[in-house]
């Protein structure tokens, strides 16, 4: 098929995340095969790909040119923030300010027990929060990272996005599994979701026991009471399964909304709520987005916008952030409800 577009991705990270970079490369190759059928290619550039032959530029200058030409810039951090990765991040920021590209996404891997982050990384995170309002993705395993990226890719390639589906706790694009929701904290650590999964497992056991044995009549037939009980168990299992499916879809939809935040500015409330959601703490995430506070800020933002002699880009962004808070609140509320009613 004719190639209509090439999505260029620049992946920046230090050597400490070599294994994650390798697996990410495999993901890109898988996605490239899927998108190729729609005339779209996905091209990944990493520092390992660079031709070391001298071409009149130092290597980092070449990397920086690649950053400017990319559609997506991904920076991965773990325990430290390398100076070249920071330089590439700043180049990407400047390019985005000038040409609205590349979209910038930052991933920070969770520390293991006993590990600590460097001062450089702590300062970089402070800069992103306090000065840039930039929200990063936290990940503890590759399922989480893959899911984040695929949702972000949907934002970049919005013209012909490939539908993300959830089937039996597996997030899929076409026939390819992207993530197991049992390994993603916003589902695996979600109390309601765990309770539903636990109840379904219990029902499966009870139905299995009833089907293999159960109470029998004098001539070996299954008793009327047992047949009724088995029918009730099957009916409840079907209901619980539908509740799980609804909540999985709502949770992934909320994660998609959060993906829209990532790579851009967001309010401190949105960032805190998103972090709590990612941890599976739906109730706390909802509580952070207090309606009285949001209404007061929205009223103030609208007043400033309406009374400005010439509305600025910052005033417009304030309005957009307020609207984003309400949208995120609605998504989080829905994602905490498994019952259809």
Residue spans for each PLM region:
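C-terminal interaction surface of TIR/SEFIR-family domains
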Residues: 110-249, 253
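Short coil/turn connectors between adjacent alpha-helices in alpha-solenoid helical repeat scaffolds
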Residues: 107, 221-244, 277-287, 318-319, ...
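Hydrophobic, repeat-rich solenoid/adaptor surfaces of innate immune receptors and signaling proteins
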Residues: 10-11, 141, 273
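Conserved TIR/SEFIR loop-to-helix hotspot centered on a Trp-containing motif
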Residues: 55, 79-97
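Short, charge-rich amphipathic alpha-helical segments embedded
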Residues: 245-252, 261-262, 282-321
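A short helix->loop->beta-strand "cap" motif at the edges of active sites that frequently abuts
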Residues: 95-112
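Conserved N-terminal substructure of TIR/SEFIR domains
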Residues: 1-72, 76, 98-102
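Amphipathic alpha-helical repeat scaffolds of TPR domains
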Residues: 231, 263-275, 303-336
């Amino acid at each position: 098929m004719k190639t209509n577009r090439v999505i260029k991705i620049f992946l920046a990270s230090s050597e400490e995340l070599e294994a994650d970079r390798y697996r990410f490369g495999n993901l890109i190759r898988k996605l490239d095969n899927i998108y190729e059928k729609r005339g779209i290619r996905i091209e990944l550039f990493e520092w390992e790909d660079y031709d070391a032959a001298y071409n009149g530029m130092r290597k980092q200058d070449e990397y920086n040119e690649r950053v400017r030409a990319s559609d997506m810039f991904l920076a991965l951090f773990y325990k430290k923030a390398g100076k070249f990765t920071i330089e590439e991040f700043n180049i990407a920021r400047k390019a985005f300010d000038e040409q609205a590209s590349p979209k910038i996404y930052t991933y920070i891997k969770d520390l293991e027990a006993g590990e600590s982050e460097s001062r450089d990384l702590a300062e970089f995170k402070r800069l992103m929060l306090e000065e840039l309002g930039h929200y990063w993705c936290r990940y503890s395993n590759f399922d989480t990272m893959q899911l984040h990226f695929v949702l972000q890719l949907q934002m970049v390639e919005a013209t012909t996005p490939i539908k993300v589906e959830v089937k039996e706790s597996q997030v899929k694009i076409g026939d390819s599994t992207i993530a197991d929701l049992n390994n993603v904290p916003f589902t695996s650590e979600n109390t309601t979701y765990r309770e539903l999964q636990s109840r379904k497992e219990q029902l499966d056991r009870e139905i299995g026991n009833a089907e293999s044995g159960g109470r029998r009549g004098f001539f070996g037939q299954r008793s009327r009471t047992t047949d009724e009980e088995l029918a009730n168990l099957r009916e409840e299992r079907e209901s619980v399964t539908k509740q799980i499916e609804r909540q999985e879809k709502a949770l992934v939809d909320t994660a998609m909304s959060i993906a829209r935040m990532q790579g851009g500015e967001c309010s401190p409330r949105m960032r805190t709520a998103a972090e709590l959601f990612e941890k599976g703490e739906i109730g706390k995430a909802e509580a952070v987005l207090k309606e009285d506070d949001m209404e007061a800020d929205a009223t103030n933002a609208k007043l400033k916008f309406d009374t400005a002699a010439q509305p600025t880009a910052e005033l417009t962004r304030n309005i957009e952030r307020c609207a984003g808070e309400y949208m995120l609140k609605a998504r989080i509320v829905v994602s905490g409800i498994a019952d259809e009613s």
